From Swiss-Prot:
<comment type="function">
    <text>Catalyzes the release of premature peptidyl moieties from peptidyl-tRNA molecules trapped in stalled 50S ribosomal subunits, and thus maintains levels of free tRNAs and 50S ribosomes.</text>
</comment>
<feature type="binding site">
    <location>
        <position position="108"/>
    </location>
    <ligand>
        <name>tRNA</name>
    </ligand>
</feature>
<dbReference type="GO" id="GO:0000049">
    <property type="term" value="F:tRNA binding"/>
</dbReference>
<keyword id="KW-0820">tRNA-binding</keyword>
<comment type="function">
    <text>Hydrolyzes ribosome-free peptidyl-tRNAs (with 1 or more amino acids incorporated), which drop off the ribosome during protein synthesis, or as a result of ribosome stalling.</text>
</comment>
<keyword id="KW-0963">Cytoplasm</keyword>
<protein>
    <recommendedName>
        <fullName>Peptidyl-tRNA hydrolase</fullName>
        <ecNumber>3.1.1.29</ecNumber>
    </recommendedName>
</protein>
<dbReference type="GO" id="GO:0005737">
    <property type="term" value="C:cytoplasm"/>
</dbReference>
<comment type="similarity">
    <text>Belongs to the PTH family.</text>
</comment>
<feature type="active site" description="Proton acceptor">
    <location>
        <position position="19"/>
    </location>
</feature>
<comment type="subunit">
    <text>Monomer.</text>
</comment>
<feature type="binding site">
    <location>
        <position position="62"/>
    </location>
    <ligand>
        <name>tRNA</name>
    </ligand>
</feature>
<keyword id="KW-0378">Hydrolase</keyword>
<dbReference type="InterPro" id="IPR001328">
    <property type="entry name" value="Pept_tRNA_hydro"/>
</dbReference>
<dbReference type="GO" id="GO:0004045">
    <property type="term" value="F:peptidyl-tRNA hydrolase activity"/>
</dbReference>
<feature type="site" description="Stabilizes the basic form of H active site to accept a proton">
    <location>
        <position position="87"/>
    </location>
</feature>
<dbReference type="InterPro" id="IPR018171">
    <property type="entry name" value="Pept_tRNA_hydro_CS"/>
</dbReference>
């Protein structure tokens, strides 16, 4: 069983924020696979098939850890079979990277997940949102029109990479999508 989780904030006012790029990728995955979220449990929403689960926490970004811990424990998904998709300020808009493990790099949602899961051995797909001196304000700002043209392409590529993760080893996905 594989589990893909896109991070974001549930309030509609944050829908187009940089911090919600994980949600945006999950929406694209669902669209590409012609699936719809149909379950709500563990403070999150998800769809489950026989092979995989695609999910979004319904807590705010910085409190994502309990959802990841609870859904992965309940469905017996090991950390190496989870892919967390989230925004990363250390990458420019238009950049993305898949990593098999690592620290939080200051991203509070992933920091909470690593704390609650008690491991850094969780694959992740980082989507660049650019840097700014005022981090809190920046992550809660919307992409500019020019940036959104770029991020839309990245969201499509990230969705393809995440779908590939459902059926392949993380190393294969990394070799195909990290360029």
């Amino acid at each position: 069983m594989k589990l893909i989780i896109g991070l974001g904030n549930p309030d509609p006012k944050y829908q187009k924020n940089r911090h919600n790029v994980g949600y945006m990728v999950v929406d694209k995955i669902l669209e590409n696979l012609r699936l719809k979220i149909n379950k709500e449990k563990f403070s999150g929403i998800f769809v489950k098939t026989e092979e995989f689960i695609i999910a979004k926490p319904t807590t705010y970004m910085n409190l994502s850890g309990d959802f990841v811990k609870n859904i992965s424990t309940y469905f017996k998904v090991s950390p190496n079979n989870i892919l967390i998709i989230y925004d990363d300020m250390s990458y420019e808009v238009g950049q993305a990277a898949i990593k098999p493990k690592g620290g939080s790099n200051g991203q509070n949602g992933i920091k909470d997940i690593l704390l609650k899961m008690n491991t850094e051995e969780i694959p992740r797909l980082k989507i660049g949102i650019g840097k700014n001196q005022e981090a809190a304000k920046h992550v809660l700002s919307d992409f500019t029109l020019e940036e959104f043209k770029i991020i839309d392409l990245v969201i499509n590529q990230a969705a393809e990479a995440a779908i590939s993760f459902l059926f392949n080893d993380i190393r294969i996905v990394m070799n195909s999508y990290n360029k």
